[in-house]
Amino acid sequence: IGAWLGVTTAVLMASAAAAPPNTRAVLLMGASLVILWCGLGGLVMRRMREPCRAFVQGIRLPWQVKFVAFATFLALVEEAITTTLTNLAPLFGVPLGAAYITASTNYLDVVALHSVVVFVPMFVGWAVLLRYYDFSRNEVFLLFGVVGLVGEMTIGGAKALSEFALWIYVYGIMVYLPAYSLP
């Protein structure tokens, strides 16, 4: 999946040069998301997983609460990245408001009305599932990524299937470290 994400991101970046300005901006914002969230964010989480696990396990709350809170925090971070990229539209060659990778340029609007508000019940559902099933952290990553892909398909149609690696990573990273931090 990671190799496919790398290949598709490279193709998107290469095709961005010939695309109309708004399309180019969206493609470059998407590629930037892959670099910042999937690449850099994923690498930092992987390198810091043991200290994070020790920290999270030291918090005196039920693990289900910690899982939901940690996944929600990571979803908020991911949306901060995407909203920032949307607000950087002029850096990508188009006026602010001409190209979006989020529902809005307003972070609070995005998280409270469009994304994280929808994710939290899904995180609660995963906490319930993890109480009864012993999924590995990698299985949680993949399965939640597929759930995210299905969600993106409800918004963007079958086109989202061609971006399956992107959506599996974007969503999977939100739950990988919380799942890794389980007792």
Predicted regions mapped to residue ranges:
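Aromatic-rich, lipid-facing transmembrane alpha helices and their immediate juxtamembrane interface loops
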Residues: I1-P183
